[in-house]
């Protein structure tokens, strides 16, 4: 069992139940999955660069990424149907908790001028953020990076509101901006 999952089962569940007054233990929010995605439309023109970004995403996540393809052709963007334009990875279970632990304790402190993430979610218990650079991850070899590439990370929880979601993620170690 990962350190973060153990912390969740022993401490975080109890503090969430006390704070929000859940009557049933099944109401307590749980982290269901983490989705990491990269839009690689620019890199799609260069197969070596596209492959390099796929390798970086697999090193960051620990599993092989799914290549997302264009649904239809758009001549103005020089895009053909079926052409790879992105990649995504869905983390669940142990890998999800390990990634969350690494992201909170190793990666986010490496972000330049980091003062915390925004507390705004989607209103339905999910939280997303965008990173501008993949080089903040220690798994990425800086000498092999040909072009900086951003990514989107989405935390999907069973929380019903943004307050429940951000409280859960904050207790798990994600740092948010303090309200002024």
Curated annotation (Swiss-Prot):
Keywords: Ribonucleoprotein, Ribosomal protein, RNA-binding, rRNA-binding, tRNA-binding
Entry's Gene Ontology BP terms: translation
Transmembrane segments: none
One GO molecular-function entry: rRNA binding
InterPro entries linked to this entry: Ribosomal_uL5, Ribosomal_uL5_bac-type, Ribosomal_uL5_C, Ribosomal_uL5_CS, Ribosomal_uL5_dom_sf, Ribosomal_uL5_N
A UniProt-annotated Pfam family: Ribosomal_L5
SUPFAM superfamilies for the chain: RL5-like
Cellular component aspect of the GO annotation: ribonucleoprotein complex; ribosome
Subunit structure: Part of the 50S ribosomal subunit; part of the 5S rRNA/L5/L18/L25 subcomplex. Contacts the 5S rRNA and the P site tRNA. Forms a bridge to the 30S subunit in the 70S ribosome.
Its biological purpose: This is one of the proteins that bind and probably mediate the attachment of the 5S RNA into the large ribosomal subunit, where it forms part of the central protuberance. In the 70S ribosome it contacts protein S13 of the 30S subunit (bridge B1b), connecting the 2 subunits; this bridge is implicated in subunit movement. Contacts the P site tRNA; the 5S rRNA and some of its associated proteins might help stabilize positioning of ribosome-bound tRNAs.
Similarity annotation: Belongs to the universal ribosomal protein uL5 family.
Entry protein name: Large ribosomal subunit protein uL5
Organism: Chlamydia felis (strain Fe/C-56)
Name of the coding gene: rplE
């Amino acid at each position: 069992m990962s350190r973060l999952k153990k912390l969740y089962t022993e401490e975080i569940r109890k503090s969430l139940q006390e704070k929000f007054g859940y009557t049933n233990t099944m109401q307590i929010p749980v982290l269901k999955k983490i989705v990491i995605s990269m839009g690689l439309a620019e890199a799609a023109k260069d197969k070596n660069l596209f492959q390099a970004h796929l390798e970086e995403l697999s090193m960051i996540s620990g599993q092989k990424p799914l290549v997302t393809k264009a649904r239809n052709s758009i001549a103005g963007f020089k895009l053909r149907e079926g052409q790879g334009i992105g990649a995504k990875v869905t983390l669940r279970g142990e890998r999800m908790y390990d990634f969350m632990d690494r992201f909170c304790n190793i990666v986010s402190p490496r972000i330049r001028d980091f003062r915390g993430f925004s507390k705004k979610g989607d209103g339905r218990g999910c939280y997303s953020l965008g990173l501008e650079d993949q080089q903040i991850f220690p798994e990425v070899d800086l000498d092999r990076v040909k072009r900086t590439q951003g990514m989107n990370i989405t935390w999907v929880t069973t929380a019903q509101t943004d307050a429940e979601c951000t409280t859960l993620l904050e207790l798990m170690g994600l740092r948010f901006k303090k309200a002024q």
